[in-house]
Amino acid sequence: MHVYIAGGTGFIGKCLTKKLLEQGNRVTATGTRSNFPLKAHPRLSYVQADLTRKGRWQESLAEADAVVNLVGKTIFGRWTKAYKAQIRESRILTTHNIVESLESSRQGLLINASAVGFYGSQGDTILDEDAPPGSDFLGEVGMGWESAALEGEKKGIRVVCARFGIVLGEEGGAVNKMLAPFKFFIGGPLGNGEQWFSWIHIDDLCAAMIWVTEHQELKGPVNFCAPNPVRNKEMTKIIGRILGRPTFIPTPAFAIRMVMGELASALLSSQRCVPKKLVSADFQYTYPDIESAFREILKK
């Protein structure tokens, strides 16, 4: 199988590339860097490109059997008007350009990144793929992002909108930001700590994406998260126990809002997501609970 990974130089893209190559697949990865940050491999091609703009990179899509789109500006920044525009455009415009380039006669599958932020903050409500979208900024972006991807269905392409939980792994993602306070003995819950945290280990995420390529019944929105979401305060206790650090110093919600601005709404939001479709398709998790995930990441 030949897989085209848009955004292949990022945290998730590098992991997925490695796993696909290990299984004997061919990979074409794109990114904005001048060189791909992995060792040269005979079945790996790299295209440097800005996918928000049309260009020759679209021609290289023609040979792929499946396309994985991971492109998107990180949400971890000050949400100025300009930054929010970058968050939106990097996702929706890139997806539009990719879908426009797909050929129904060739590509059978588009896995397009989305996020559990699609649901907004819904408290203790259990959220499977049929749950409604949120009305906040990330919910709005998620709807636009997925709508752009689902245009591919008009070409007869199987489209999977991969609603990622927070991705945990040793080499990137949110882990370093999450662990930083614990290193200084000031780790604690965010706000009241009651908000639900939907997450997934990077290895399970990449395995699930490969699983999707092999299971035709999976289409439309799919929650890519572990089957056991956890409250922020429970996760904090688990991290503290693994690291041998105290966890009794909460960060007040007002302080988070003062420092982070509008981004605080995302950090304090509650999404109790369950991967109904992946579980129904018998996908097996290596790290179904957050303690096993953090013990692997921290080698404890």
Role assignments for model-derived ranges:
Residues H215-E262, R295-K300:
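Mid/C-terminal beta-alpha module of Rossmann-like enzyme folds, strongest
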Residues H96-D136:
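Conserved Rossmann-fold NAD(P)-dependent oxidoreductase catalytic core, especially the SDR/UDP-sugar
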Residues V3-Q23:
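N-terminal Rossmann NAD(P)H-binding glycine-rich loop of SDR-like oxidoreductase domains
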Residues L179-G187, Q195-P229:
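Alpha-helical substrate-binding/gating segment
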Residues M143, K155-I157, L168-K177, V212-V222:
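Glycine/proline-rich active-site loop of Rossmann-fold NAD(P)-dependent oxidoreductases
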Residues S265-K300:
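C-terminal amphipathic/interface module of NAD(P)-dependent oxidoreductases
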Residues S114, S147-E170:
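Conserved beta-loop-beta element that borders a ligand/cofactor-binding pocket
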Residues S45-T94:
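NAD(P)H-binding glycine-rich loop region in Rossmannoid oxidoreductase-like domains
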